[in-house]
Amino acid sequence: MAAGRNDPCPCGSGIKYKKCCFAKERSPSDPASLLWRRLNAVDEELARELLRFALKSLGKDFLDRSSDEFFGTSSVPIDVSSPEMQGLGPWMLYCRTIPVKDWLRDGPAKRGTIASAYLQRHASRLDAFSRRYLEACVEEPFSFYEVEDVTPGQGLEMEDVLRGERRYVSERSASGMLRPRQLVWGHVISLESLHLFAGMGSIPLEPIDKLEIVHLLAWLRKRHRLVTTAVLRREDASVRGT
């Protein structure tokens, strides 16, 4: 029987398998590595295509309006190379709900995101993998995730604090920087049986900051009883403003 990630390593080191030979056995051709390489190319290409679609369909001031809503102020200049774009970009394209009246052309019949409107109008332009990726990004809202364990260079065991779900997120760069008990505001999607970050806030939160998220959770439960994916979409502004 193959060793589980949390089982003692078969090599006899006494260390958990995921901290020992698991990482060594991961090759550039394993599913996560192959998916990562494919995703990097698809993500950049789709982001450019969605941005072109948004500017054409919503007007040139779309970026300014999105930034104002995201930061709650109009005083933050947009700099695509800034760390803040790490969270703003994915939220703007995949999660920000656009009123029907804002669309100049190619708009949906009801409120929706840029990505969902693009899928309605131009899904036929996408290959199957790109379409699945875009659909996964549309389905998932941003939430707060607490790091429970880290396998550097491979991924993180994380808990969605608001929905109470645990996931192993395949993530190379963040797994080298984040520590257990830190929290991130992130956009975790499910694709090809893996969980991946499609977007993340630029600054990790420390354990002391969790109290504010617990207060948010209590407020959400008071309003909705059960915190679901649909609730997080509906309460995006409150979650983002925490």
Predicted segment positions?
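Acidic/negatively charged segments and metal-coordination signatures
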Residues: 1-157, 161-242
